[in-house]
A protein has these predicted regions:
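Acidic/glycine-enriched connector segments
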Residues: 1-198
Length: 198
């Protein structure tokens, strides 16, 4: 909370590789400016795991355009998570945004049932559960994707549908979903920015 005001909670899901990042940035910026006009006196918070691509783009713009507070839910221990970043430039981009965050926290995914590993399908499941966490808590979810169905369970298309339907499948929902910060028992508004056409 900022000055006692409860923030509007934004979330992000999207592709790690954006076909036209400049176009996506312009489209997201336009949507955020519209949010600022629609809610001129409200503070904002952004939930973003800061994966490459859409996560970082939306987080950066939420900070720049809306003055949003950044919260970073991680799907696994941070040292392990960073191994998914492409190189030094990506590591530096992550570090720059991380320094601007209010909080970086590892989700209690292992507490959701059997301990998951960190490789293969178990790793993908961790990402899906992080996406579910964001979809479960965002009042407005920015989905920067091509509109296609998810290639595997828990991809961008699934996360967007979970938010729209107001229902995350039980196997992806963290057990503390209803008693942690950023949980609001209402419908999520989805802002779809087409990854290829804006």
């Amino acid at each position: 909370m900022r000055d006692g005001r409860i923030p509007i909670v934004l979330g992000v899901t999207g592709h790690r590789t954006l076909p036209d990042e400049e176009m996506a940035e312009a489209a997201v910026r336009k949507q955020m400016q519209a949010l600022r006009e629609r809610y001129p006196h409200s503070p904002f918070a952004i939930l973003s795991p800061l994966a490459e691509g859409a996560d970082r783009l939306v987080a950066r713009l939420a900070i720049d355009v809306l003055g949003a507070d950044l919260y970073v839910p991680l799907p696994m221990p941070e040292d392990e998570y960073r191994t998914d970043f492409a190189g030094e430039e990506s590591q530096n981009e992550y570090d720059t945004l991380r320094k601007q965050s209010e909080s970086v926290f590892e989700l209690d995914i292992d507490g959701a049932g059997d301990a998951l590993g960190l490789n293969g399908e178990a790793r993908n499941r961790r990402y899906a559960m992080a996406g579910a966490f964001v979809a479960d808590r965002a009042q407005i979810l920015f989905a920067v994707w091509d509109g296609a169905d998810a290639a595997g369970t828990g991809g961008t298309g699934d996360i967007a549908q979970w938010a729209l339907n107001g229902h995350v499948p039980p196997e992806y929902r963290l057990p503390e979903a209803r008693d942690r910060p950023f949980y609001y028992p209402n419908e999520t508004e989805l802002v779809h920015v087409h990854a290829e056409t804006g």
